[in-house]
A protein has these predicted regions:
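Function-dense linear segments that define catalytic or interfacial modules
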Residues: 82-167
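Catalytic palm subdomain of template-directed nucleic-acid polymerases
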Residues: 192-203, 305-320
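C-terminal polymerase-core module
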Residues: 1-47, 214-262, 266-268, 308, ...
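Short Gly/Ser/Thr- and Asp/Glu-enriched loop/turn motifs at secondary-structure junctions
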Residues: 4-8, 176, 298-302
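Conserved "right-hand" nucleotidyltransferase catalytic core of DNA-directed polymerases
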Residues: 1-105, 121, 128-131, 191, ...
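Catalytic palm active-site di-aspartate
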Residues: 127, 191, 208, 296-310, ...
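Conserved catalytic core of nucleic-acid polymerases
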Residues: 63, 77-78, 82-85, 160-293, ...
Length: 349
């Protein structure tokens, strides 16, 4: 069986093995990743199919794709666009170096392909939970601000509040659920989606959300206020007053209007984070130039900056990059950047 072939996969799984059919499309039973994940407990062959598809994707898109992108100087040169995304994030294309996998260990291995030139190393620094820090600041939520500024683990702290127990009794599963709620709130997640993400009932998911919003009451008020403000002004804006106009808020179609409300909630958060990293890039570049260091900013991946520098200057460069990132702007919440040094991108990150 060719695991990439949809037809052959259907025949093998649903006819030959007699596995339950979870989802049907116009062309037949679906064998997409979501369906296969739901069938993992039915037969061990599912794991093999998923792994094969993952390896095939990594091989074709990243291994072979990146090899084709290497230019005559032995380097890969991408193009950056400042105005491609509506949130204000910088995007990368031809090739897109911002979508190198990071969620899985196998995917992260792809970063080993990217190495510094002889005698140099890579300095990599990224913001820690910048969108949640921005949310805490915009919402002026005292509990969340205090948690961040005290150096607490925000997901453990949230879990302790949501599950009403001391932090030392918070389990990994509780922290994982709290993490999903923390990040989900930024994107306007509902009980249905949260329940699906963390594997609980819709009722439990709603209880988590309600408990979260009771704990962080400032966030709750902010989420309502920011939509009302956007509806009144006709646009949503970042901390630095960059606007995104939202005609969707006046739509008669309920789904379009709901989408506009989600944008009104998360644009100030995502947009402010995007503004901050751009400010940090300017400050880092200027500082490296002012101090006449043999160092060059070579890549930005959303909340992450990568600098190529001489090994001799690497510790100084790491100090500069993290310092400028953390002081990119003044907020009620301290910004935090974590960094490392390595010969390749995998090691540096």
């Amino acid at each position: 069986m060719n695991s990439i072939s949809i037809h052959q996969s259907r025949v093998a799984l649903f006819e030959d093995l007699g596995l339950p059919c979870k989802k049907k499309t116009k062309s037949g039973y679906s064998t997409n990743a979501e369906v296969l994940e739901g069938l993992r407990s039915e037969n061990p062959v599912i794991d093999c199919i998923l792994e094969y598809r993952t390896l095939t994707k990594l091989k074709s898109t990243y291994c072979e794709g990146l090899l084709k992108a290497i230019q005559s100087d032995g380097r890969i040169h991408t193009s950056f666009n400042q105005v491609e995304t509506r949130t204000g994030r910088i995007s990368s294309l031809e090739p897109n170096l911002q979508n190198i996998p990071i969620r899985t260990e196998l995917g992260r291995e792809m970063r080993k392909f990217f190495i510094a030139k002889d005698g140099d190393v890579l300095v990599d620094a990224d913001y820690s939970q910048i969108e949640l820090r921005v949310l805490a600041d915009l919402a002026n939520d005292e509990n969340m601000i205090n948690a961040f500024n005290s150096g607490a683990d925000i997901h453990t702290s949230t879990a302790a509040q949501v599950f009403n127990m001391p932090e030392e009794f918070v389990t990994k599963q509780m922290r994982s659920s709290a993490k999903a709620v923390n990040f989900g709130i930024v994107y306007g997640i509902g009980a249905f989606s949260l329940a699906k993400d963390i594997g609980v009932s819709r009722k439990e998911a709603q209880e988590y959300i309600d408990s979260y919003l009771a704990t962080y009451s400032g966030v709750n008020k902010y989420m309502t206020h920011v939509i009302d403000l956007a509806r009144e002004k006709g646009y949503s804006e970042t901390l630095f007053k960059r606007r995104r106009y939202l005609p969707e808020l006046n739509a008669t179609n309920h789904m379009v209007k709901a989408a506009g409300e989600r944008i009104a909630r998360n644009m100030p958060i995502q947009g402010t984070a995007a503004d901050i990293i751009k400010i940090a890039m300017i400050k880092v570049d200027k500082r490296l130039d002012d101090e006449k260091l043999d160092a060059h900013l070579i890549l930005q991946v959303h909340d992450e900056l990568i600098v190529e520098t001489s090994e001799a200057d690497s510790k100084k460069v790491l100090e500069i990059v993290t310092e400028e990132m953390e002081n990119a702007c003044q907020m009620k919440v301290k910004l935090r950047a974590d960094g490392a040094i390595g010969k390749d991108w995998y090691t540096a990150h």
